[in-house]
């Protein structure tokens, strides 16, 4: 019985934190008087690092660039990170966990931070749509 417990898959969130964040609005205050028809570009990336046995740092990097015509309205970058304990999972499931499951946990924190920064910059509310990290992961491994 004790042997079975040792081999049981384990996952635990140890910490979620902001590793880096920036907000730039270089064309204020003039941009406030421009007709609000923005183009929004979203870039996502995930990195992972094994800290020690069964302990991993996952960093979800989210970059939002908003322009009106060619003028930069704002640029928002966040590296939302987490430390996760993951044990007794085979390599294939571990990669899925690190590149799909963990970013899925981190994304709501990044989305909230971006929304707050944009609001504090005096721009219209920005609520990023949910991301299907599972689909992104499967597209990446093909």
From Swiss-Prot:
The keyword Transit peptide does not apply. The keyword Protein transport applies. One of its GO terms (molecular function) is unfolded protein binding. It comes from the Bacteria. Keywords: Chaperone, Cytoplasm, Protein transport, Translocation, Transport. One of its GO terms (cellular component) is cytoplasm. Gene3D superfamilies: SecB-like. It is found in: Cytoplasm. Signal peptide: none annotated. It holds the Pfam family SecB. Its main location: cytoplasm. One of its GO terms (biological process) is protein folding. Belongs to the SecB family. One of the proteins required for the normal export of preproteins out of the cell cytoplasm. It is a molecular chaperone that binds to a subset of precursor proteins, maintaining them in a translocation-competent state. It also specifically binds to its receptor SecA. Homotetramer, a dimer of dimers. One homotetramer interacts with 1 SecA dimer. This is Protein-export protein SecB.
């Amino acid at each position: 019985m004790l042997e079975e417990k040792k081999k049981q898959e384990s996952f635990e969130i140890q910490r979620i934190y902001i590793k880096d964040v920036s907000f730039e609005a270089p064309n204020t205050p003039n941009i406030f008087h421009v007709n609000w028809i923005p183009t929004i570009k979203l870039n996502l990336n995930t990195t992972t690092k094994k800290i020690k046995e069964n302990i991993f740092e996952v960093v979800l990097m989210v970059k939002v660039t908003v322009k009106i015509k060619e003028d930069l309205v704002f640029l928002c970058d966040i590296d939302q990170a987490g430390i996760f304990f993951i044990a007794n999972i085979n390599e294939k499931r571990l990669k899925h966990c690190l590149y799909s499951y963990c970013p899925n946990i981190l994304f709501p924190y990044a989305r909230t931070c971006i929304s707050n920064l944009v609001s504090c910059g005096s721009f219209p509310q920005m609520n990023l749509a949910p991301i299907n990290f599972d689909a992104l992961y499967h597209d990446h491994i093909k």
